[in-house]
């Protein structure tokens, strides 16, 4: 490793030691929210050698802020994980215990890259205003098709007046049962999202040009579930609550249905080939998928 790469590799976690759980920052604590949106979080207790997360009803969309266990990274990086997602019983895809109509589930887990909020003030969430979210994620679980495995990518930008909330653009695609490997590369303003399903080759899932993202980002793991109920809540109240029912409707119970397990989270510095330095990596006409995969996912 060259020195900078060795430094970033030290942030990685193979989830072999329960004590390393304390190395990961939690967004709800750092931004002074009163509610932990995880019902369960452990390394090794649920499954040896894996980090397990079971979320309460929650979401990342527009100004809904969900779970993020993260570290802070300056400059370019490649973040990689291997993840499995199930319903809470571990017997099938997320959302399959109770089912639901299309677009009601959105129970997924993956890698999230986020701009730190510059407006955070100690020591309660009264600082918060809508419209300030900037993030990208790549996740695996059940999205628009309840009870089926899918891949979701999302790019959220801050509001531009007269907009009153952050704006999210998402894409959903099919996937097979896990484990699935997810990889997010940040190279200058570009975010390259890669996926490898079990027994298959790496593929480029999505490319983004995000010059609005700062040089230092929050990078980590996220989980979210039960959009049908989470989406009934106002943004601030969602972000500050452990949700057990629909907004102002206690008779309509929440139905969170996700168990996510991560094998590792690894960080390296990307080594961009000289001919591609300065190229528009978000443009397939300028840089092909094969060229990206050659340096972001080399080998078998």
Language model features: what each stretch is:
Residues 1-300:
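Extracellular glycan-recognition regions
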